[in-house]
């Protein structure tokens, strides 16, 4: 009996999507609200965050536009994990809490959020969307990212 293997690179080639990196200091719900208002879309918080085996969990908003065959996803790139470190100093123990940041896409660790737009009929105007997001006053910068060159593109399958 023949076996069929799916290769991640083959799967990613079949996907047609645009990826926008967004830098801002806003909470996830506030950015989703401002993007909804600016682009006239309806991103809603998913019941389940995007969670990985290493314990990292990223906030996740999505909206399916069935009329235009587009799927919008806003995902946080930053997960902060508090780690308790116990150090021995003589006969006393010192407990110290440090924060470790785990990015969803390590190649873009400075990006706060990613907006992923899956478009089945490839009718999206990337420039218009990018300019609209860039013109949100609380957004520091936003730019297109070539997802084909990412080594961690498997993290974008959701």
Labelled PLM ranges:
Residues 9-27:
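Terminal, regulation- and interaction-focused segments at domain boundaries
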Residues 23, 63, 106, 111, ...:
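Primarily extracytoplasmic/secreted proteins
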Residues 50-97:
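Surface-exposed, low-hydrophobicity interaction/linker segments
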Residues 16-19, 71, 109-114:
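Short, surface-exposed beta-edge/turn micro-motifs
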Residues 24-56, 62-65:
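Aromatic- and glycine-enriched beta-alpha-beta binding-site module
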Residues 5-13, 99-110:
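Short, flexible, solvent-exposed loop/turn segments with mixed acidic/basic and small polar residues
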Residues 11, 26-32, 124, 136:
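A structured, charge-rich N-terminal accessory region that forms the first stable segment of a protein
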Residues 110-158:
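Glycine-rich, aromatic-bearing surface loops/beta-hairpins
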């Amino acid at each position: 009996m023949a076996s069929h293997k799916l290769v991640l690179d083959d799967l990613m080639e079949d996907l047609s999507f645009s990826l926008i990196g967004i830098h801002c200091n806003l909470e996830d719900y506030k950015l989703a609200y401002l993007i909804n208002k600016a682009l006239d879309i309806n991103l809603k918080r998913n019941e389940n965050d995007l969670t990985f085996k290493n314990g990292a969990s990223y906030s996740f908003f999505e909206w399916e536009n069935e009329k235009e065959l587009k799927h919008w996803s806003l995902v946080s790139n930053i997960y902060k994990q508090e780690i308790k470190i116990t150090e021995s100093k003589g006969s006393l123990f010192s407990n110290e809490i440090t924060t470790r940041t785990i990015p969803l896409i390590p190649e873009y660790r400075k990006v706060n959020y990613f907006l992923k737009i899956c478009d089945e009929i490839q009718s999206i105007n990337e420039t218009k969307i990018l300019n609209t997001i860039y013109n949100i006053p609380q957004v520091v910068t936003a730019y297109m990212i070539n997802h084909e060159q990412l080594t961690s593109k498997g993290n974008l399958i959701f």
